[in-house]
Every structure is written in C-alpha cells, then in structure tokens.
Amino acid sequence: MQKNKAKEPRLIVGVIILMISNIIVKVIGVLFKIPLHDLLGDRGMSYFNIAYNLFTTLYLVSTAGLPTAISMMVSEARVKGKKAEVRRIFRTAVCLFFILGTIGTSIMLFGAGGLAKLMGSADASWAIMAISPTLFLICISSSIRGYFQGHQNMFPTACSEIIESAGKFILGIVLGTWAVRTGKSIEICAAYAIAGVAIGEACGLVFLICAKFLHKQDYSYTLAEDDGTVSSSKKILKNLLLISVPVMLSSVALNLTSTIDTFTIINIIKRYSSAETAEAAYGNYTTLAVTLFHLPSAFIYPISTSLAPALSAARAAENKIKERSVLSASVKMTVIISIPCAIGMALMSKPILGLLFSNEASVNSAAPLLSILSPAIFFSAILTVTSAALQACHYQRKPIISMVCGIVAKAVASCALMSIKSIGILGAPIGTLVSYFVMAAVNFMFVLKYVSSEINIFKLIIKPIVASGLASILTLTSYNAIYRAGHPTVGTVISIALTVFAYFIFLFVLKEFNRDDIMIFPHGEKIYKALVKMHLMK
C-alpha cells in the first residue's frame, strides 16, 4: 500500500523534471538565436531555419510516434511484469531506428541541392548538408528516450536534452563566429553554425548510451509477476508501427504548419518584392516571432510526454479512477499554464522581443507577427495534450483527422492572405492561428467522444482567463510606469515577474485549486499546510 502511495505522484514528478529541463533547453535555444541572429542577420538565419525546418520534417517522417509507441509498449509490459518483453521491445526499436536514421540522413545529404531549390533558396543547400547527420543521431537517441519514458523515468531524457542544447549553443556560436571572422560567405557561415546542432546531438546520445548501460530494471517491475511469455520481434515491430504510424502522420501534419511557411513565404513574397526582401522576411519571422511562440511549449511538452505512459499504464491495469484523474489533471495543468502565456505574449510582444534581440528594426518587424501568433499558444497546448490522450488510449488515427483539417485551413488562409501585398508576411501567423484553432477544436471533440465526456473546457478556462486579465492590468501598468522612467529593460523584467506572481495569487483567490490538486505534487501535504497558513486555501 505504501509503495503504491509513493508512486502516486510519479506523473507530476515526470512533468516537473521535464518542465525544468525544457525551460533550460528553451532558454538556451533563445540565447542561441540571439547572437546567431547578430552574426548571420535575417538573410543568413533564413538559410539556417530552412535547413532546420527541413530536418524537423524529415525527422518526424522517419521517427515521430516511435518514441511514444516505445514508451506506451514498455509501460504496458512493465505493468504486466514482462521484463524480457521490455528488453525485446527496446532491441527491436533500436534496429528500426537505425535503418530509418540512415535513410533520412542519406536523403538530406545527397538531396540537399534539390531540396533547397524546391524551397526557393538554393544557397541553403550547405546548411542542409551540415545538419544531415543529426537525423541519424536523434533516431538512436529517441529509441533510448522512449525506453526510459516507458519506465516513467524522465531524468535521462531531461539531462540529454540539456546536454544537446548546451552543445548546440556553444559549438554553433563558436563555429559560426569563426566562419564569419574568416570571411566566408553567409550561406557557408549558416552551415558552420548549424553543424553545432549535430555535434550537440552526438553529446546527448553519448550520455543516453551511458545511462542505458547503468540503468537497473528491477525497481520498475512490482505490479505483477512475469508469466514468462514474450512476443516475437515480428509482432513487436508490427505493434510499434501500428501505434507509431498514425502518431507520425499526425506529428508530420502538425509540423506542416512550419513547412508550409518554409515553402510559401519566400515564394509568394518574391512575386511582389525582391528575393532578398522575401528571405529577410522569412528569417525575421521564423527567428524572432516563431522562436518566442514555441517558448511556452517548454511547460506543455512535459505534460503530454508524461501523460502517454501514465495513461497507458492506467488503462492496462484497468484502473478507471486513475485514468480519469491523470487525464483531468493534465488538461487542467495545460489550461492554467497556456492561457497566461498566450495573453502575456500578445500584450508584451515588443518589450519581450526587445529584451532578447538588439536589432530594433527586426524587433519592430517581428512584434506584430508575434502578437497575432500568441493566441495560438493556447490552442497548440490543448492540441498537444489531447493528442497524447488519444494516442495513449489507442485512438491514434483521430488526431490525423484534426491535423488534416488544420493544415487545409493553414494552407488556404496563409496563401490567400500573403498573396495580398498590403497583408504580406502577416498572413503567415494568421494562417497558423486559424490552423491551431481548427485542430484543437476537432481534437477536443474526439477526446469528449472517445476518452472522457467529463471534461468541461469552458469551466476550466474561465478562472484562468479572469486571473490572466487581472494580472495583465498589473503588467501594463507596471511596465508603462517604469518605461516612462527611462528603464524599458528593467520594466519588462519586473512586470513579467509581478505578473507571474499575481496570476497565481489571483488563481488562489478565485479558488481554482483544491486540496487534491496540491496533493499530487511531491511533498503535497507540506505545500497544502503552508498554503492554509497563508490563507490561500482552506
């Protein structure tokens, strides 16, 4: 009994570990883009981002869904006490990832020229070749991460991601700076900078391999006795593909929002402007606005990553109460985190960008793009957590329908709007916002129909919206007061800190949290008693 009680907060522990690592990774990512943007400029960053977005798309085509499939299958086998099957799942997955990684890297390496021309920027081919080894490395890393996530052990994943990001940051800047100082062309400088991504990924893989060799399995198999049966490698491979292919298709569809931008922004804007202007607009949008848009995902990704194996384990154990508890807690956390991020980013887009990037002209261009894009943070978060829930409950095909609907909306809206010269690049974030709204709405309807009809999204969002609105008044008031005193940077930092503090105080005042919400955290009893003493809870 005590053992089960100890394991109760495992979901939230995994979320916290991944959340901390993701915040660090995202901060490193932003810090990487700031000096890189200063080195390469908007045009050089367009080559960097074209290569990186292409890599992301091919990575998703090659392997997206397989880490989720591994974590779900390992989690279910672990609950049933099947140690030997867990080992076979891992070996089968590594072999599959090795093949897929080799194919993907070959496509990028030998097809770089054609792919770059297809995206309207032939000079990006050098950057595409430089990042190509990353695809093979990340395939192997993903198989090991899926194994650990199936054990609901998020620590190796978290550490490896931090190592990768740190390596990318340090080596990317060093190589990019060296290339610029030695007078190499801007496209070659972008290739040197993006090579740091591959080297950083290699460092993370070395850590994961060491962690796998040191991992002790015995502690995880306490829920059932091993009956000695082990599925064949062929059956495991079939199950991996049955679970992962729909997940991969939905992930690819989701990534197509950025892929559509990669293919359309330069090609459409070139019709009524120069190629250099089009490349600069793409580089500005993807480096500044899109980078900040993805920053809040550091808080959401850990929830969905921890949700899939936890929900799979609850279903395998036929524990309906825990299943509902895990799902409702995940959705509630997602809503509470994403709403203030969306509102705050929309209101403070220019000060936040100005805090991070020194080029005033680039900040002025990107600020309205980020303001338009920011509401999509909420819809993206809902989409992420509902997709994880559907996939964990073996409704992997449902998110594909949502994604297809959203991609059609994105393509139509972005292309139609960007074709209007007076709208131009603004059409890209508008199309993305429409796309995420459609995908999130359709996905949530599937969750209500197939997973749980007890989630009331409107009830969940009312108090966070009210708290965010009240906190936003404080944000704007404090920022404007300090800005008028001649300290815009200080004003941005202080107003953001005050807003975060005020938001959670308002949530407690509005009685958004109950005792059960607090008890799922490690040391929940102590936290609850402290909150009662502060008169924030009864």
Residue ranges and their predicted role:
Residues 137-160, 375-405:
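Membrane-interface junctions at transmembrane-helix termini in multi-pass inner-membrane proteins
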Residues 477-538:
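Membrane-proximal transmembrane or re-entrant/amphipathic helices at the cytosolic face
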Residues 10-68, 98, 105, 109, ...:
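Signature of the first transmembrane helix
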Residues 64-79, 297-318, 327, 387:
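Helix-loop junctions and terminal segments of transmembrane helices
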Residues 1-28, 84, 88, 227-254, ...:
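N-terminal membrane topogenesis motif
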Residues 113-131, 346-377:
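Interfacial segments at transmembrane-helix termini and the short loops linking adjacent helices
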